[in-house]
Amino acid sequence: MKKFLITILALCCAACNSDWRKQYDEVAPTRTENMMVRKGDKYGLVSPKGLEITPVKYDYIDTNPPQDMPFYDVTINNLRGIIKPSGEEIIPAKYDFIWYSQGVFVVKLNDSYQLLDSHNKSLTPWFDEIDVFYQGLAFAKNTGYYGFLNPKGELVLPFVYDDADHFNESGYAMVKYKGKWGMIDKKGNTKLPFEYEHAEPYSEPTEEWEDYYYMLIKNGKELTIDKEGNFL
Protein backbone atom coordinates (compact mmCIF):
# COMPACT_ATOMS: atom_id res chain seq x y z
CA MET A 1 0.00 0.00 0.00
CA LYS A 2 2.84 2.38 0.91
CA LYS A 3 4.63 1.74 -2.38
CA PHE A 4 1.36 2.32 -4.23
CA LEU A 5 0.89 5.75 -2.58
CA ILE A 6 4.48 6.74 -3.35
CA THR A 7 3.96 5.79 -6.99
CA ILE A 8 0.74 7.84 -7.16
CA LEU A 9 2.47 10.87 -5.61
CA ALA A 10 5.36 10.57 -8.05
CA LEU A 11 2.98 10.47 -10.99
CA CYS A 12 1.09 13.49 -9.64
CA CYS A 13 4.34 15.44 -9.26
CA ALA A 14 5.39 14.54 -12.80
CA ALA A 15 2.02 15.71 -14.08
CA CYS A 16 2.31 18.95 -12.12
CA ASN A 17 5.81 19.54 -13.48
CA SER A 18 4.55 19.31 -17.05
CA ASP A 19 1.18 21.04 -16.54
CA TRP A 20 2.74 24.37 -15.48
CA ARG A 21 3.42 25.13 -19.15
CA LYS A 22 -0.30 25.26 -19.90
CA GLN A 23 -0.81 28.50 -17.99
CA TYR A 24 1.45 30.38 -20.43
CA ASP A 25 0.91 31.36 -24.05
CA GLU A 26 4.56 30.72 -24.85
CA VAL A 27 7.51 28.96 -23.24
CA ALA A 28 10.94 29.49 -24.79
CA PRO A 29 14.45 28.26 -23.89
CA THR A 30 17.26 30.59 -22.85
CA ARG A 31 21.03 30.14 -22.60
CA THR A 32 20.57 28.77 -19.07
CA GLU A 33 18.29 26.07 -17.68
CA ASN A 34 15.68 28.73 -16.90
CA MET A 35 13.02 29.54 -19.49
CA MET A 36 11.26 32.64 -20.73
CA VAL A 37 7.48 32.60 -20.60
CA ARG A 38 4.79 34.81 -22.09
CA LYS A 39 1.32 35.43 -20.77
CA GLY A 40 -0.60 37.74 -23.09
CA ASP A 41 1.90 40.44 -24.04
CA LYS A 42 4.02 40.18 -20.88
CA TYR A 43 7.18 38.14 -20.31
CA GLY A 44 8.98 36.64 -17.34
CA LEU A 45 11.44 33.90 -16.37
CA VAL A 46 10.70 30.55 -14.76
CA SER A 47 12.82 27.71 -13.39
CA PRO A 48 12.87 24.27 -15.05
CA LYS A 49 10.11 23.25 -12.62
CA GLY A 50 7.94 26.19 -13.61
CA LEU A 51 8.55 28.38 -10.58
CA GLU A 52 8.48 32.06 -11.49
CA ILE A 53 11.86 33.66 -10.78
CA THR A 54 10.69 37.03 -12.11
CA PRO A 55 7.19 38.46 -12.29
CA VAL A 56 5.60 38.12 -15.72
CA LYS A 57 5.61 41.89 -16.17
CA TYR A 58 8.11 42.75 -18.88
CA ASP A 59 7.22 43.93 -22.37
CA TYR A 60 10.49 42.44 -23.64
CA ILE A 61 13.35 40.28 -22.35
CA ASP A 62 16.47 39.87 -24.46
CA THR A 63 17.53 36.32 -23.57
CA ASN A 64 20.10 36.21 -26.37
CA PRO A 65 22.47 39.11 -25.62
CA PRO A 66 25.98 39.50 -27.11
CA GLN A 67 28.57 37.05 -25.79
CA ASP A 68 30.25 39.72 -23.65
CA MET A 69 26.93 40.68 -22.02
CA PRO A 70 26.18 38.30 -19.09
CA PHE A 71 22.82 39.95 -18.35
CA TYR A 72 19.38 40.37 -19.92
CA ASP A 73 18.03 43.68 -21.18
CA VAL A 74 14.37 44.12 -20.13
CA THR A 75 11.74 46.69 -21.10
CA ILE A 76 8.63 48.06 -19.39
CA ASN A 77 6.67 50.86 -21.07
CA ASN A 78 9.62 51.60 -23.40
CA LEU A 79 11.96 52.04 -20.41
CA ARG A 80 14.92 49.72 -20.02
CA GLY A 81 16.46 47.82 -17.15
CA ILE A 82 18.79 44.88 -16.53
CA ILE A 83 18.25 41.50 -14.86
CA LYS A 84 20.48 38.49 -14.31
CA PRO A 85 19.66 35.20 -16.06
CA SER A 86 18.78 33.96 -12.56
CA GLY A 87 15.97 36.53 -12.47
CA GLU A 88 17.58 38.94 -10.00
CA GLU A 89 16.96 42.57 -10.91
CA ILE A 90 20.14 44.61 -11.23
CA ILE A 91 18.87 47.87 -12.69
CA PRO A 92 15.16 48.76 -12.59
CA ALA A 93 13.44 49.45 -15.91
CA LYS A 94 13.42 53.24 -15.75
CA TYR A 95 15.98 54.38 -18.32
CA ASP A 96 15.57 55.48 -21.92
CA PHE A 97 18.54 53.37 -22.97
CA ILE A 98 21.27 51.18 -21.46
CA TRP A 99 24.62 50.12 -22.92
CA TYR A 100 26.86 47.47 -21.34
CA SER A 101 30.54 48.24 -21.80
CA GLN A 102 33.62 46.76 -20.10
CA GLY A 103 31.78 45.61 -16.98
CA VAL A 104 29.70 48.74 -16.36
CA PHE A 105 26.51 50.27 -17.72
CA VAL A 106 26.00 53.58 -19.51
CA VAL A 107 22.42 54.69 -18.85
CA LYS A 108 20.49 57.46 -20.55
CA LEU A 109 17.57 59.33 -18.99
CA ASN A 110 16.04 62.58 -20.25
CA ASP A 111 19.07 63.32 -22.50
CA SER A 112 21.55 62.88 -19.63
CA TYR A 113 24.01 60.02 -19.12
CA GLN A 114 25.51 58.24 -16.13
CA LEU A 115 27.73 55.24 -15.36
CA LEU A 116 26.37 52.47 -13.11
CA ASP A 117 28.12 49.37 -11.84
CA SER A 118 26.61 45.87 -11.76
CA HIS A 119 25.11 46.61 -8.32
CA ASN A 120 23.19 49.67 -9.58
CA LYS A 121 25.66 52.00 -7.86
CA SER A 122 26.29 55.38 -9.50
CA LEU A 123 29.90 55.78 -10.60
CA THR A 124 29.54 59.29 -12.03
CA PRO A 125 27.24 62.28 -11.80
CA TRP A 126 24.93 62.93 -14.74
CA PHE A 127 26.71 64.17 -17.87
CA ASP A 128 25.56 65.54 -21.22
CA GLU A 129 26.99 62.49 -22.99
CA ILE A 130 28.95 59.29 -22.28
CA ASP A 131 30.22 56.99 -25.02
CA VAL A 132 30.89 53.26 -24.64
CA PHE A 133 34.43 52.25 -23.73
CA TYR A 134 37.21 51.74 -26.25
CA GLN A 135 40.68 50.71 -25.13
CA GLY A 136 39.65 51.25 -21.51
CA LEU A 137 38.42 54.84 -21.88
CA ALA A 138 35.14 56.49 -22.87
CA PHE A 139 34.65 60.10 -23.84
CA ALA A 140 32.11 62.10 -21.85
CA LYS A 141 30.68 65.57 -22.30
CA ASN A 142 30.10 67.97 -19.43
CA THR A 143 29.00 71.62 -19.70
CA GLY A 144 29.92 71.67 -23.37
CA TYR A 145 33.39 70.11 -23.15
CA TYR A 146 34.71 66.58 -23.58
CA GLY A 147 36.97 64.50 -21.37
CA PHE A 148 37.65 60.78 -20.87
CA LEU A 149 36.52 58.38 -18.12
CA ASN A 150 37.75 54.96 -17.07
CA PRO A 151 35.30 52.14 -16.14
CA LYS A 152 35.55 53.15 -12.47
CA GLY A 153 33.96 56.48 -13.39
CA GLU A 154 37.19 58.38 -12.74
CA LEU A 155 38.02 61.34 -14.95
CA VAL A 156 41.31 60.41 -16.62
CA LEU A 157 41.52 63.30 -19.09
CA PRO A 158 39.85 66.60 -18.13
CA PHE A 159 36.84 68.28 -19.73
CA VAL A 160 38.80 70.64 -21.97
CA TYR A 161 38.13 69.38 -25.51
CA ASP A 162 35.61 70.90 -27.93
CA ASP A 163 34.91 67.49 -29.48
CA ALA A 164 36.31 63.97 -29.30
CA ASP A 165 36.43 60.59 -31.00
CA HIS A 166 37.05 57.31 -29.17
CA PHE A 167 40.52 55.83 -28.71
CA ASN A 168 41.55 53.45 -31.47
CA GLU A 169 43.25 50.09 -31.01
CA SER A 170 46.65 51.78 -31.30
CA GLY A 171 45.86 53.87 -28.22
CA TYR A 172 45.27 57.23 -29.92
CA ALA A 173 42.24 59.49 -30.25
CA MET A 174 41.41 62.47 -32.41
CA VAL A 175 40.20 65.39 -30.28
CA LYS A 176 39.33 69.00 -30.98
CA TYR A 177 40.96 71.66 -28.81
CA LYS A 178 40.49 75.41 -29.12
CA GLY A 179 38.83 74.96 -32.50
CA LYS A 180 41.41 72.65 -34.10
CA TRP A 181 41.79 68.88 -34.32
CA GLY A 182 44.83 66.90 -33.21
CA MET A 183 45.73 63.44 -31.92
CA ILE A 184 46.50 62.47 -28.31
CA ASP A 185 47.52 59.34 -26.43
CA LYS A 186 45.82 57.97 -23.33
CA LYS A 187 47.82 60.26 -21.06
CA GLY A 188 46.77 63.34 -22.99
CA ASN A 189 50.15 63.80 -24.66
CA THR A 190 49.97 65.34 -28.12
CA LYS A 191 50.73 62.90 -30.93
CA LEU A 192 49.60 65.21 -33.74
CA PRO A 193 49.47 68.99 -33.22
CA PHE A 194 46.15 70.83 -33.03
CA GLU A 195 46.17 72.49 -36.43
CA TYR A 196 43.48 70.74 -38.50
CA GLU A 197 40.06 72.16 -39.31
CA HIS A 198 38.46 68.75 -39.81
CA ALA A 199 39.13 65.12 -38.88
CA GLU A 200 37.05 62.14 -39.94
CA PRO A 201 37.70 58.38 -39.69
CA TYR A 202 37.10 56.21 -42.74
CA SER A 203 37.96 52.78 -44.11
CA GLU A 204 38.38 51.40 -47.60
CA PRO A 205 35.45 49.32 -48.97
CA THR A 206 37.68 46.23 -49.15
CA GLU A 207 38.92 46.55 -45.56
CA GLU A 208 37.47 45.87 -42.14
CA TRP A 209 36.21 48.86 -40.15
CA GLU A 210 39.05 48.33 -37.66
CA ASP A 211 41.50 49.10 -40.49
CA TYR A 212 40.50 52.71 -40.71
CA TYR A 213 42.33 55.96 -41.40
CA TYR A 214 41.66 59.63 -40.74
CA MET A 215 40.99 62.24 -43.35
CA LEU A 216 42.24 65.64 -42.18
CA ILE A 217 41.81 69.11 -43.62
CA LYS A 218 44.41 71.84 -43.10
CA ASN A 219 44.15 75.17 -44.90
CA GLY A 220 41.63 73.60 -47.29
CA LYS A 221 43.94 70.72 -48.19
CA GLU A 222 43.00 67.08 -47.54
CA LEU A 223 45.55 64.86 -45.80
CA THR A 224 45.42 61.22 -44.70
CA ILE A 225 46.94 59.56 -41.64
CA ASP A 226 46.82 56.05 -40.24
CA LYS A 227 45.77 55.10 -36.71
CA GLU A 228 49.24 55.88 -35.36
CA GLY A 229 49.21 59.41 -36.78
CA ASN A 230 51.57 58.66 -39.68
CA PHE A 231 50.91 60.56 -42.91
CA LEU A 232 50.16 58.42 -45.96
Give residue spans per PLM region.
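Residue-level detector of conserved, function-critical positions
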Residues: 16-232
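Sec-dependent N-terminal signal peptides
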Residues: 4-12
